[in-house]
Structure formats: C-alpha cells, structure tokens
Design a protein with these regions (language model features):
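Low-complexity, acidic Ser/Thr/Pro/Gly-rich terminal tails and inter-domain linkers that flank the onset
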Residues: 169-187
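Extended substrate-binding grooves/exosites of carbohydrate-active enzymes
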Residues: 1-2, 6-160
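Extended hydrophobic-aromatic, low-complexity segments
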Residues: 99-101, 108-109, 161-164, 186-187, ...
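Beta-strand-rich structural segments
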Residues: 88-92, 152-153, 189-206
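Short, solvent-exposed loop/linker segments at the N-terminal edge
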Residues: 78-83, 183-192
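Edge beta-strands of extracellular beta-sandwich domains
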Residues: 158-170
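A general secondary-structure signal for short beta-strands and their flanking turns/coil
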Residues: 85, 146, 172, 189-191
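Short, intrinsically disordered, charge-balanced linker/junction segments flanking boundaries
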Residues: 1-3, 174, 204-207
C-alpha cells in the first residue's frame, strides 16, 4: 500500500489506485484452514458491518485531504501484558507526531519521504520496516502500561495542531447505541445504521 500511495504522489498522471478489497465479503473464507467455520474474507479495509479497520485510516489520510485524520492503533487494553513491548502506530495526514503514555513522551516521529521502492527492498530494510516509515509513524519499543495514550500531531512548521487520546478500558458496564442520523423518512424504505458498542463506566470502548 505504501508504494502505491508513493506512486500516486510522484506521478501526476495517476488519478487513483485500486485496493483489494474495499470491503470484506462473503465467500473465499480466510483463514479457511484454522478458524472453521469461516464464511468471510478478511482482506478489506472495511469489515462486513461497514466499520473501518485500522488500515482504512492509512488510506484516508491520503485520499481525504479536506478532513483531519489522526488514528492510534492498537487499542490500549492488554491485561497481562504489563511491561511488555507493545508497538504503537499512528496514521495521520500530518507529517509528524509525538506519543505520550501516561504523560511521558515516547518521542517524536516524522514521515520519511526519502523512502522509495528501490532503496527499501533489501533484507535489512525489510527487517527494519523501512518501507512502512514513509507514511506510517511507528513507535516500535513502547511498553504497555494501563492508562492513557495521547498523540500530538504537528504540521510542517512544527506547530502542534491536533491531538487524540485512547484509554485502557475497565470492565464492560453498558451497551451504547450510536445512530448514523437523527431522522429517517416514514416511507418504509429509508433506514439508519446503528453501531452497537460495549463500553466501561467511563464510556471507553471494550475491545
């Protein structure tokens, strides 16, 4: 995906790119040999329910320049992983960002736009995830501790322009229903999609 995005940025004649697949789909179950009875693929950047996966935000940060993208992954609820290395990735349309765990800076990362398909194909570059550093901001040595992960994004002038937080979830407390619209037509055809979320007492999503 990184090199496809790079080519689109580099060559003005390219007007877009094709992603296999946009959505998960029924049939071609994967992995068919372990998780029986699988009935769906897992290749999409959006799942069967229409919910974006993490990788969706990598594409969104380049396809949608009119809106801010600032996405942290993974979630931060890992009971039993205390003290273990748990990498953090950030997908954003800004060039750099800084991550904080419970208020302590984990350092600032900047996209490396010098990375090309040619200079990132050797075994050392692959082992170092060099190709991914062109469009992803990665903190590979962060250690898990329950609490808050905060990301602060910076523009090309070094100014802090956006921030986002995710929190360790407690025990499931209640179910939250979120509709995608406030009104529907009473014509027997209109509809609304309702997202169901299991959250803790503070409203944090329970993974």
């Amino acid at each position: 995906s990184e090199m496809c995005i790079r080519d689109r940025d580099k060559y003005p004649a390219i007007c877009g790119e094709f992603v296999w697949t946009g959505f998960d789909y029924l049939g071609e179950p994967t992995p068919y040999y372990t998780d029986w009875p699988s009935h769906s693929s897992l290749f999409g950047i959006i799942d069967l329910a229409g919910l974006p996966k993490d990788r969706y935000y990598l594409y969104r940060s380049h396809w949608n320049k009119d809106e801010e993208t600032l996405h942290i992954l993974p979630h931060w609820t890992w009971p039993g992983r205390e003290g273990e290395v748990t990498p953090i990735f950030v997908y954003t349309n800004y060039p750099s960002a800084e991550v904080f765990i419970n208020g302590k800076s984990q350092g600032k990362r900047t996209k490396d736009l010098t990375v090309t398909a040619e200079n990132s194909a050797d075994s050392a570059s692959i082992a170092d995830f060099k190709r991914q550093k062109r469009y992803r901001l990665m903190w590979m040595d962060t250690k898990y501790e329950p609490g808050t992960v905060k990301v602060v994004a910076y523009n090309d002038k070094g100014e802090a322009v956006a921030e986002k937080e995710i929190h360790t979830a407690g025990k499931p407390d209640h179910i939250e229903l979120v509709a995608d619209r406030n009104e529907i037509k009473a014509d027997g055809k209109d509809l609304s999609f309702v997202t169901v979320r299991v959250v803790d007492k503070e409203g944090n999503l329970c993974p």
